A protein has these predicted regions:
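Acidic-enriched and Gly/Ser
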Residues: 1-126, 152-186
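Short coil-to-beta-strand transition motifs
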Residues: 2, 130-138
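Short, conserved beta-turn/loop elements at beta-strand boundaries and strand-helix junctions
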Residues: 132-134, 144-149
Length: 186
């Protein structure tokens, strides 16, 4: 499947995604396609409380996967939406997202299209990923903020390097001495 990007108004990504899914299902039910807005989980602080929120991975972009982009483009063109700005093009044809870029994005997201929380263990400047979507992508982590529970990762998109924050759970290894000093209640 080939992947393409649609440029839309910021904040309207989910609305455009839902509209396109309905249009494609109605006008082209036999065609294989996928429309998604990748998201990332993130810890944010509001009024002193830590909240887990979802943010769009690439604001203003909706990703379309299909082998029939011209047909899907015609459906979009005939049912104009004020939220769609344009389809990204390369010269006179549609700009295809590089297979290496999209494969990493697809591997990182879950079935709901979200990059979830990864459990990490930081010991003496060395990062060990215990589980989560980053388990096979240690090399894309550029910075860890243990206090905020965030990791800055590098994701290539449309031939550009994008740095985005995602949620991580920072684990600690306990020394035997600290375990012995704990008080147990019965």
């Amino acid at each position: 499947m080939r992947w393409y990007a649609l440029f839309v108004k910021t904040g309207k990504e989910d609305e455009v995604c839902d509209t396109l899914k309905k249009l494609y299902e109605f006008f082209s039910p036999m065609e294989a396609y996928e429309v998604m807005v990748p998201k990332r989980g993130l810890y944010e602080y509001h009024d002193g409380k830590r909240n887990y929120v979802l943010r769009t991975l690439f604001p203003s972009y909706v990703l379309i996967g299909t082998e029939q982009i011209v047909k899907l483009y015609e459906i979009m063109k005939n049912h104009k939406s004020s939220n769609i700005i344009r389809m990204l093009k390369n010269d006179s044809c549609f700009q295809e997202i590089d297979i290496r870029e999209i494969s990493i994005i697809i591997d990182l997201i879950n079935r709901e299209g979200v990059i979830g929380i990864s459990d990490i263990l930081v010991e003496e400047e060395k990062v060990n990923i215990i589980n989560g979507p980053l388990i096979h992508y240690k090399g894309i982590i550029k910075k860890i903020n243990k206090r905020k529970g965030r990791a800055k990762i590098q994701v290539d998109f449309l031939n550009k390097q994008c740095f985005v924050d995602i949620a991580v759970r920072c684990l600690e290894r306990y020394e035997e001495e600290s375990i012995k000093n704990q008080i147990t209640f019965s």
